[in-house]
Amino acid sequence: MTDRDFPVSSIEDPLRVLGKHFRSGDQSVFLKAVTFGPFPAGAFPDEGMAQLERIRNELGANAIRMYEIPTLEFLHECARIGLRVFITLPWSQHVDFLRGGGELAEADELLIETIERFRGHPALAGYFVANEIETTLVRWMGRRKVREQLERLIEVGRANDPDALFSYANYPSTEYLIPGNQDFLSFNIYLEQREDFAAYLNRLQNLAGNKPLLVSEFGVDARTHGELTQAEMLEWQVEETCLSGAAGTTIFSWTDLWQRGGQTIEDYDFGFMRRDGTPRPSLDVVRECWEPLSRTSDVVELAGGPKLSVIVCTYKGSATLVECLDSLTTLDYPDYEVLVVNDGSDDRVSEIVATYDSIREIKIDHVGLSAARNVGAKEAKGEVFVYTDDDCIAEADWLTWIAKQFLEDPELGCAGGPNIPPAPESEMQARIIAAPGGPSHVLISDTRAEHLPGCNMAVRREVFEEVGGFNPIFWAAGDDVDFCWRVLEAGYELGFHAAAFIWHHRRFTPRAYLKQQIGYGKAEAMLLPLHSKRFRGLGGAVWSGHVYTPQAPGGGFVYHGHFGYEPFQLIYPDSGSGLGGVVLHVLWWVCVVIAVVGGFFHWSGWLVAGLMLYTTFRVARKRAKRAPVEREYDGFAARWTLAGLIVAQGFLRSGVRLLRGWKYAKWSRGLEVVTTAAWKKVASGWWKLGYEKAFWSENGIGRDELLAGISAAYPEAQVDASGRTDLILKRCLLWNWALVTATEYHADNNRLTRTRLLARPRFLIRMIVLPVLLGVLVVAPFTPLLFTDAWKILLGVVSGYAALTAATRIFMKLRRPAILRIAEGLGMDPVE
């Protein structure tokens, strides 16, 4: 039998991802997984295959997670029993794997060999390309570089098996390390307070975006808490995982018998099975929790749930209406109605609605979206109005998650969830889906929103009436923004749940997309006089919360904490405005045109225009690179087309907004935004002069002991409050030395500690020197207009700057702190 002649399997369809769920065939799958191994040598001579029947039947699991590469026979047995297998790639990720490249080559080879062995196997669920890369090591290597390598590993895997699923098993200390191309978000979470666990799951759901969330590890030590408490905690863990809408959970572990790095672990008892093979009470408890679960919404209690009125307003939307109404007639909610407001009394819409006995049609003259929504509310019978669009498709449990929010908080004004675009059917559609400006929620916390798009927004009847419904001046867009702001001003909150998602088609052509963005620009101009305090100068709306987009993590600030040990290292995303927004604004293009015209009088104008254009397309290219394009349609052409859409979107939307709303724009505030963004860029800049050294210890001495020794030797040293580095050593009036360290843990008590000294100019110097340099760069093109020997002046400035930089480097190397002497005093040996 070849490795492709797989035996008969009780698993009929492979595991796939669709939205925030796992699917097998046309059925949603809630993953009920348990970790399996690695076992001490000789614990299970048959790889533990005799345990698989117990895992499937006694525990009720449908998947296992492994940390070693199994044999093909092992996967055959899993397929026969009905257990899917997640394989964690075991490679040397505990060291600086970016330095030599050997570890990455090892990982590539192992991944390709493993995929070649198991490609197409019915039991294969997916691969974890790495697991919990240590936080200070990630900081040392650089989070962007590490993320790029994880993404590269995933691409290597996909190139060899396009149908397999890939992810990185993350943990809270590197929360920011999220590969943009992974198929689902995975997190190992060990939070032992129910409220903390539930709150963190909500956060992870928002980080997951349009992808499923899998709890890739959760466990409770029975030795610490007792066996009954372990069972109780695992019970609420399963419940909270489901209530968050996560796609599955993995419990650590099947048995107390396990090892790490060749060492048998005997200090913890996480297993369902004791070391002697007898079960703990947690086995029966978890089985009873898992048994009735086929999807996450099964745990939601709907007793006393409100009557819901689903309102669809359509204006000549027959092209997508059938798909929308088909989904609305099969919703799994006990008490709801569906109303279609036919704005404009389109005959084709009436014909479609007439084929559904349970749907009411309301014909009206063409009055616009806001007025149509008000008509729907007037005719509705429900306690809650649930709005969606004619190009949306609802999941069966959509209303369950909407109702859950109102049941949990009787004072909630509105509720909603994400809107996710269906898979693209063409290259251009894939690019438009990745383009900016689509309808998106704005969150001020993980469960509270500042804005909910009208395609997925529910509102209580009494709140709707109190704020006066939708403002009829908005005919096509902007109505939901105005409505949400008025609800907030009335003192109500907007709820949000990541599982309450709907599918929402984006525009199908570039022309339709750009027309939509023009409409959004018009709507923003209409919002300006109504909510002037919520807009910044010449730009768009100012949000207190974060606008969620499917863009891969890129910018933003990470708080690493004291010596990089913060247990929950959050990423604080940038606003997406600042200088990046400036170079895409229509006024930037006005300046480009002025510079081009000036070029006809002197060549320096064309130079300025060229630099401005380069800056614009550099920003657009960077944003296009971070945008998630469906991999089937990704490539060079896709990224450059997307960059063009980004430039066009910024120009058209800001142009229409300014053209329609210039009377209400606060020009002084716009100038303030630009200058503030430029000032922050200068103030946060680092001049790095890296000086690296590594130290070896066979006595368990690592970075903690070294940092303590350095702190003692330099009493004036300060802990870096941001955690970007460990210590800031103030050695010079004009400069600071910053120290960052990381320790690699090798076999036995061996440690390799890496140190990096970074020279950083003091704040005053940065505020003086950098603006001067920027000024020189700006003025340089115009020197021919001012001086006859301009080239001599420019050459002198450049030469002086180069000489100053070289002298500074030599001086600072001579003045660097004596780390070597301190390390040797601790018994650490320098490594060349």
Per-segment meaning from a language model:
Residues 16-17, 23-182:
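Active-site mouth of glycoside hydrolases
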Residues 385:
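Short aromatic/hydrophobic "clamp" motif used to bind/position activated sugar donors
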Residues 139, 144-244, 271-273:
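Extracellular glycoside hydrolase catalytic/binding regions
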Residues 326-335:
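Short, acidic, metal-binding catalytic loop of nucleotide-sugar glycosyltransferases
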Residues 252-303:
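Aromatic-rich peripheral "rim/lid" segments of glycoside hydrolase catalytic domains that contact
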Residues 397-429, 493, 505:
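Conserved donor NDP-sugar-binding/catalytic core segment of glycosyltransferases
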Residues 327, 342-350, 392:
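A conserved acidic beta->alpha catalytic loop
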Residues 417-418, 432-450, 465:
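Short, flexible, basic/aromatic active-site loop/helix in glycosyltransferases
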